[in-house]
C-alpha cells in the first residue's frame, strides 16, 4: 500500500467520525508503547494507525457506557 487514504479506511469503517475516534485512540496506544499490528516502515503513528484500520487489523467496539 503506497498511500493510505480516508476512502481506504471507510471501506472498513462506515462512519467518518468513528474513523477519527478509532485512529486517535490507536495513536494514543502507539505513543504509550503498544506494538504496531503492521510493519510501521518508519511512518508516524497517525499513518500507522490508518494503515492498520485500512488493513482490517482494527475494529470498532461500541460501548453502552458513557464516560463523564
UniProtKB/Swiss-Prot annotation:
GO terms for molecular function: DNA binding; DNA-directed RNA polymerase activity. Transmembrane segments: none annotated. The keyword Cytoplasm does not apply. The keyword Nucleotide-binding does not apply. It is an enzyme of class 2 (transferase). GO terms for biological process: DNA-templated transcription. It catalyses: RNA(n) + a ribonucleoside 5'-triphosphate = RNA(n+1) + diphosphate. GO terms for cellular component: DNA-directed RNA polymerase complex. Its EC number is 2.7.7.6. Keywords: DNA-directed RNA polymerase, Nucleotidyltransferase, Transcription, Transferase. Promotes RNA polymerase assembly. Latches the N- and C-terminal regions of the beta' subunit thereby facilitating its interaction with the beta and alpha subunits. PANTHER family: DNA-DIRECTED RNA POLYMERASE SUBUNIT OMEGA (PTHR34476:SF1). Belongs to the RNA polymerase subunit omega family. The RNAP catalytic core consists of 2 alpha, 1 beta, 1 beta' and 1 omega subunit. When a sigma factor is associated with the core the holoenzyme is formed, which can initiate transcription. This is DNA-directed RNA polymerase subunit omega.
Amino acid at each position: 500500500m503506497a498511500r493510505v487514504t480516508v476512502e481506504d479506511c471507510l471501506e472498513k469503517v462506515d462512519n467518518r467520525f468513528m474513523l477519527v475516534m478509532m485512529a486517535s485512540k490507536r495513536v494514543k496506544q502507539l505513543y504509550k508503547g503498544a506494538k504496531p499490528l503492521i510493519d510501521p516502515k518508519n511512518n508516524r503513528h497517525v499513518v500507522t494507525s490508518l494503515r492498520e484500520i485500512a488493513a482490517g487489523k482494527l475494529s470498532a467496539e461500541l460501548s453502552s457506557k458513557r464516560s463523564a
